[in-house]
């Protein structure tokens, strides 16, 4: 958490294996290797310059063999491009709860998987319309039309 909050990509590199597989709902496919994870961190911090992680109270942590589950929350204000896919900054603040699953090898994270509600984040940022809104109903109409034309 400190590596993220300090924007310290070198500290992150020390926590993960060279062949890390990093899966996050914000990524279209897992990041593989230290440089890819560092770039994901940089891109996340460009999109959310005040991005911060915290622990719930009480902390949520479970360890079984080489697997660690860790609960957290993340918050930040969308002030830079969100890549991928390239959403323009909305200036809106988001906060979401989530947890990580780490598979450890030789004291470092070899496989990382984050779990959080990306749709909730998109709604908070105004990228996806609120449930029941006119915009959502319009998207439903467009999706149905696309499905009908695509058959």
Predicted regions and their residues:
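C-terminal and inter-domain tail/linker signature
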Residues: 1-151
């Amino acid at each position: 958490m400190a590596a993220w909050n300090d924007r310290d990509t070198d500290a992150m590199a020390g926590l993960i294996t060279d062949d890390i597989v990093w899966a996050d709902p914000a990524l279209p496919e897992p990041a593989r290797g230290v440089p890819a994870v560092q770039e994901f961190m940089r891109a996340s911090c460009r999109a959310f310059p005040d991005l911060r992680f915290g622990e719930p109270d009480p902390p949520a942590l479970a360890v079984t063999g080489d697997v660690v589950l860790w609960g957290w929350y993340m918050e930040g204000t969308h002030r830079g491009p969100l890549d991928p896919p390239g959403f323009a900054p909305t200036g809106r603040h988001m906060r979401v709860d989530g947890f990580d699953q780490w598979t450890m090898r030789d004291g470092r994270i070899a496989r990382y998987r984050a779990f959080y509600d990306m749709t909730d984040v998109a709604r908070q940022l105004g990228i996806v319309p609120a449930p029941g809104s006119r915009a959502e109903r319009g998207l439903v109409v467009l999706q149905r039309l696309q499905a009908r034309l695509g058959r």
